[in-house]
Amino acid sequence: FSITRNPDTSCHQMLVDMSQRKIMIKLPWDDFTNYSALQSLPEAQSILNSLTVVPALVYVLGQLRAQSPDERNENNSDTLWYKVLSKTLSTKFDCEIESTQFDALNFMELAQKLVNDPLSDAFKFLVNSPTSSGGEDE
C-alpha cells in the first residue's frame, strides 16, 4: 500500500487506485495531514490500518470478485500488489485468487486477517488513551 495525499482538493473522500504497482490510498488534504502526524506513532498503527487499509482491501477484494477468475489474472498480474495478495491467499488461507472459492470468502473478515486483525488493538489503544472515559457502555 502507498498512502498519499489526493491532489484533487475538491475530493473529500478516501479513494483507492488499483491500477498502480502498489494499491494507492488517496486521502483528502486534511486527512492526509492528520494521517502523517499519526503514522510515526507505533501505537496508532492499528487505528490507521483500521481506518484506511481494511476498507481499501475490502474494496479491492470486491473489485476482484466482480471479475471472472481469468480476468483477475489478465487485468492485474503485472502489479506487485496482485502477486503478493495471490501468494498470501494461497499460502496462508489455502485459496487461489483465480478460483471460484475466492468468490465465496467474507471479504470484511479476510481484509482484517490480511493485516493482522487491527481492530482489537485499535479499540484497546482508544480505551487506554489519556482522553478515554474508560470505555463504559452508553
Enumerate the predicted regions with their spans.
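Bergerat-fold GHKL/Histidine-kinase-like ATPase
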Residues: 1-138
